[in-house]
Amino acid sequence: MVKGLYTAYTGMVNEQNRMDIMTNNLANASTVGYKKEGSTSQSFNDVLTVKIKDQSVGMRNVQKIGIKNPGVKIGENYTDYTQGSFRITDNTYDLALAGDGFFAIEFTNKAGETDTKYTRAGQFTLNKDGYLVTEEGDYVLDTQNRRIRLNTLLDSKITDDGTIYQNDQAVARIQVTDFEDYDYLEKYGETYYQPIDGAKTTTADAQVKSGYLEMANVQIVSEMVNLISITRAYESNQKVVQTIDGTLDVAANQIGKL
């Protein structure tokens, strides 16, 4: 009976994790460059249940009862890198990537340390010093891993290969990087990614589209349907816990009075 309580509990923990992920997806449905997340479930290893020390089969004999599965556990959380839809902005520095790849960003943490992060969120602008930066103020890098600085008094044109022109002169080229295996990317915040040990870069085939933004790849209706399904599964496990709790209460407090 207590094992049934544990099985229901693990089911609730698993559904709570899925619910948190779906809720975060819905919260970021309007976030530029956001990639939705998902979660897999994994069952615990089956256990062979046996009956031992039973007078009916002899003290030294073991009788097999059957296979028991003690419930489910969280498998893994993953990111869906499917490309999102494009929204037209007509802003030169709003950039979207058509194809696989990421913009390279010089990120500075609270301790003042810098490293390179990668993102699909191309909502860029020029700061007061003329540097191309993200909404958070992080610097966009060129193909030489340098900050991109432009003349704020001149109009810019950005071509599909990421080259920036001012006065018909190429002044910089935006770096677009891709990776052989996205399993070696770790999410940092909502739209940044950082490579982990073993990550290998490769040539990106993405085109840079100026005047567009890639929106989140979250399908709101689909996420809502999944959320309802998860809620019902959670409630079912919750009712199992309540039922077993009531049964244990009867066994402990009422049967003993007879």
Which stretches of residues belong to each language-model region?
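Amphipathic alpha-helical polymerization modules
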Residues: 1-258
